[in-house]
Regions:
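Structural signal for hydrophobic/aromatic residues that build the beta-strand cores
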Residues: 113, 135, 151-153, 167
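Flexible, low-complexity linker/boundary loops enriched in proline and small hydrophobic residues
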Residues: 47-70
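Structured beta-strand/turn binding interfaces of compact recognition modules in eukaryotic regulators
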Residues: 92-94, 140, 191-193
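Catalytic strand-loop segment that frames the active site of acyl-thioester-processing enzymes
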Residues: 62-104
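Hydrophobic beta-strand-centered segment that forms part of the acyl-chain substrate-binding groove
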Residues: 1, 8-12, 117-150
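HotDog/MaoC-like acyl-thioester-processing domains
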Residues: 1-53, 143-145, 154-199
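Intrinsic-disorder/low-complexity, polar/charged segments enriched in Ser/Thr/Lys/Arg/Asp/Glu/Gln
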Residues: 73, 84-88, 134, 148-150, ...
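Mid-length scaffold segments of soluble, non-membrane domains
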Residues: 103, 109-113
């Protein structure tokens, strides 16, 4: 396995396999939200799924197993605020992530929140790594499949090897004049393993 790509390099690594996927990718990349975050110097844009080496990526749940047509159609775009203060993720969820027909499975949403809150909190931790100790989720309203979603997270507290984060998922697209509504929200506690310290 070679060296890990930089955040900037991940932005040009993805090649859409077909026109529909290319359209989804361009829609996210050119969305007003992505453009405003990209213009903010406090945020770093990346596509972390593409940092995982291709030869092992298919073993990763969100970058491999759940990635592809009908699921997480394209590698999500992440915008991390420096020092782990907050994070915004934009992604598309397809119809094959449904529990009931057309409604995204709650376990899928829990997985995305677990990973998203972790990616927000880890940079604030001493050695930038941790494991989920607690994840509490409130499902506010049904999340329809086949749409663009936004995951927003913020680190609320850091105490030694522990970091707390909270966040939610909302729709990217909203009617003119309306605010996005929370679809599902979560709080989490992450703990850095004792052996995580690198000498």
């Amino acid at each position: 396995m070679g060296s890990m790509p930089t955040d900037v390099e991940t932005l040009s690594m993805y090649e859409a396999p077909d026109d529909l996927t290319r359209e989804i990718d361009e829609h996210i990349r050119n969305s007003a939200l992505a453009q405003s975050l990209r213009a903010n110097p406090d945020f770093i844009e990346s596509r972390p799924h593409l940092k995982i080496p291709a030869e092992v990526r298919h073993h990763n749940l969100t970058a491999g197993t759940l990635a592809g047509p009908g699921m997480i159609a394209v590698p999500p775009y992440y915008f991390n605020e420096k020092d782990g203060k907050s994070m915004v993720q934009i992604f598309y969820v397809g119809l094959d992530c449904s529990g009931h027909p057309g409604i995204v499975h709650g376990g899928f949403l829990a997985t995305m929140l677990d990973e998203g809150l972790a990616r927000c909190a880890f940079p604030a931790m001493p050695n930038k790594v941790g494991v989920t100790a607690n994840l509490q989720i409130n499902y506010v309203r049904p999340t329809m499949a086949g749409q663009y979603l936004v995951l927003r997270a913020k680190t609320t507290k850091v105490d030694g090897r522990k970091a707390w984060a909270e966040g939610w998922i909302e729709s990217l697209e909203v009617a003119e004049g309306e605010e996005p509504q929370k679809l599902v929200e979560a709080t989490a506690l992450f703990v850095e393993p004792k052996h995580a310290k690198v000498s």
